[in-house]
Amino acid sequence: KQLTTNSTATANFDGMIDFNEKKGFICDMDGVIYHGNRVLPGVAEFIQWLHDENKEYLFLTNNSGYTPRELSQKLARMGLDVTEEHFYTSALATAAFLRDQAPGCSVFAIGEAGLLNALYDAGITMNDVNPDYVVVGEGRSYSLDTLTKATNLVWKGAKLIGANSDVSGPIENGIVPACRALVAPIEMATGTQAYFCGKPNPLMMRTGLRMLHCHSAEAVMVGDRMDTDVISGMESGMSTVLVLSGVSTRETIKTYAYRPSMVLNGVGDIVSLARGEKTED
């Protein structure tokens, strides 16, 4: 079955998006651009279209483990040419939040280079004795020992920050627990509620729009998650595209009170629709 601009396949949602009229695109990465180390179909064509049409674009990812340079290099290994200024991560959003809220604060951080470097660059010091904050991101450094350490520091008064509220993330052969799942034991043990800085936090979305130099009505949010990507775009006043190349299915959508503007199989469909071509339903 073919989907065209007159198809009823999207009739239950807000309607078609004129992608040619949009100035900016904010895109998730995991499940949208790649799975693990495998680039998804249509991505190269989508990025080339963004360049050819002089669109402003930003990869806004809740993955706190990588720096923008590492993300650029990761895409380069997949044959995709995207420079560092096109990335904004939940690690950078977390560091910006702490820099603005508590300049010169100290933290006990659980995470990878992306989070640690962002914190250092924001003038935040590491402290495993009496930190102002415990900051949790994704990463291989998460263990029972670090969990116990973080729990006790929060129990003694440190405030709890999560880089993002993703419960899981897609990998090539399934899913992996993400930041929200890693923060949950600390919350449960201490009775403390964490503050999450990544999507769908509006602070991160506003920063993304500023980086694009776009008004929300001129931009599109593209992601594979209803609970972070679609809701963050919707609440920011953007058009939203849910792609089915990641963790969501059409059945997933039915469990939410809100809807994306469009549902597509992948980002390659954006190019096809912009060119007036047919896409697979």
Where are these regions (language model features)?
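Asp-based, Mg2+/Mn2+-dependent phosphohydrolase catalytic module
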Residues: 2-55, 64-88, 95-281
